[in-house]
Amino acid sequence: MAEASQLFKEFKIQSVSEFFRRNAAMLGYTGKVRSLTTLVHEAVTNSLDACEEAGIPPYIRVEIEELGREHYKVVVEDNGPGIPEKYITHVFGKMLAGTKAHRNIQSRGQQGIGISGAVMFAQITSGKATRVITSTGDEIIEAWVKIDVDKNEGKIVKKEKHPNPDGWHGTRIELEVKNVKYMRSKQGVYWYLKLTAIANPHAHIELIEPDGKLIVFPRSSEEVPEPPVEMKPHPKGVLTDDVYRMAKKTKRQSVRRFLIGEFSRISDKKVDELIEYVAALRLIKKVGDKKVQEQLYERLMKGEVKAVLRSFRGYTKVVKQVAKMMEKPPEKLTWHEAEEIVEAFKYMKFLAPPTHGLRPIGEENIEKGLKGILKPEFVTAVTRPPKVYSGGIPFQVEVGLAYGGEIPSGFELLRYANRVPLLFDAGSCVTTQAARSIDWKRYKVDDLDRTPLVLMINVVSVHVPYTGTGKQSIASVDEIYNEIRLAIMDAARRLQTYLSGKHRRLYQVKRKKTFEKYVPEIARALSVLTGESEEKIREYFLNFIESHFASKEAVEVSENA
């Protein structure tokens, strides 16, 4: 039998970077076309977030240069605020690092992996460092960055500084990557940028394809979205570990002040209520009879906490013990006590979390984006009121519907999460499931596969429940599914009204032409019978027909209004 020391001879601690180097597919780097799209997506996402946080209308330029077979140079440049020199290695060379991953805030990226994952993928396929040119308005920093995968750290292998007389600010990154392919497919870079332009009408996006062709998606709105606001965690959406770790880091003087100051919807009065619930749970757990225990838990769930407490002799002593716990320093809160607090939260009723931190695209901007890129004959948008899922995580659903015009025949679903296009794993996405559940025939769409129709769905949240680290599919959460259905049906009813009016107008045009067809013959006959001029009679009937159908159209317009 081998000794333990021999078995553990190969034991090694693996860094986060090393793990993702071996499992790049988890980040979306799987398949040659998808890998290139993922690379561009990570860079463009960073650029959009940076520009918006600085209040700058984004100007983003993407250039794909073919260097050889399945070998490309990818350049992404923006006019954002730039990156301070000391943060360059952290931004581009360290996994799980960023300005938003640790905060309860809406953002396109959530994990702090994105752009550093792109740098790593370029490095492991080409062996080359990523060139970064950036400035905050002072001197221009040019740095070549690599990732030390063993240490999960970025390192600058070469650096130069240049004067900046024009005060340029922004970031340009150049990544050399192999084993990827540029194609104009619906999973490629062109399609990704087109969809990004629809959901971000305030952005000007340019693409230079490998053949040198320049494609421009001009901005159709000058309104830069307000930067998202960090939101305090809601009691219904936290784990014991969250409370325990936050308590160790807080600067508040007592557990009571900590709960009031660092969670939403908790007041002094709510802490007093929490004390009663924690005390009641402590007492219930001491009851030997399981049946009685279950009855007491049920009463607690109904909010009968005072009655439950009064059913125990000497309950005031336990209440005082819990009240004392609330006044001690948070750093002295034990795991068990944090567990008691979180368990009590489950029985308590709280107001829904505030939703002021959510930043939807907005109905007007959705319509601008769809009109500017797709050129439809009809467009409408619906932004649903904010809701919560999993008890305390706020989210919002918005839908855009575009029909006809330059849209080719066939139904197209455009999926988004926080304005970011989701191009892959559509089958497992809640947006696809909700769209498929709609009976489109009820809304005058008889043959969905032949109808020129585009449905856009955007799910907005501080925490989008993705199905995996690749962030290309949203999990099937009941609350989100139901909101998507309601939004689609609202938009579809508007389309139904438009199509009904269109069909009526076509019918009236056909009737009008039929009447006009017989006017010359009637005019000739009446001219013979009455002696009146044939031209005069014909003009009379044509004017009468025109005025008759014009009045019908006016009535129809006023009814629709």
Curated annotation (Swiss-Prot):
Keyword set includes Isomerase: yes
Record's catalysed reaction(s): ATP-dependent breakage, passage and rejoining of double-stranded DNA
Source organism, top-level taxon: Archaea
One GO MF term attached to the UniProt entry: DNA topoisomerase type II (double strand cut, ATP-hydrolyzing) activity
Enzyme class: isomerase
Binding residues annotated for ATP, in chain numbering: N46, D78, T99, K100, G109, Q110, Q111, G112, I113, G114, I115, S116, K471
Enzyme Commission number, as recorded: 5.6.2.2
Gene Ontology annotations of biological process type: DNA topological change
Keywords: ATP-binding, DNA-binding, Isomerase, Nucleotide-binding, Topoisomerase
Entries under InterPro entries matching the protein: HATPase_C_sf, Ribosomal_Su5_D2-typ_SF, Ribsml_uS5_D2-typ_fold_subgr, TopoVI_B, TopoVI_B_transducer
Signal sequence range: none
Pfam families: HATPase_c, Topo-VIb_trans
Subunit structure: Homodimer. Heterotetramer of two Top6A and two Top6B chains.
Family membership noted in the UniProt record: Belongs to the TOP6B family.
Protein's job: Relaxes both positive and negative superturns and exhibits a strong decatenase activity.
Record-given protein name: Type 2 DNA topoisomerase 6 subunit B
Organism: Thermococcus gammatolerans (strain DSM 15229 / JCM 11827 / EJ3)
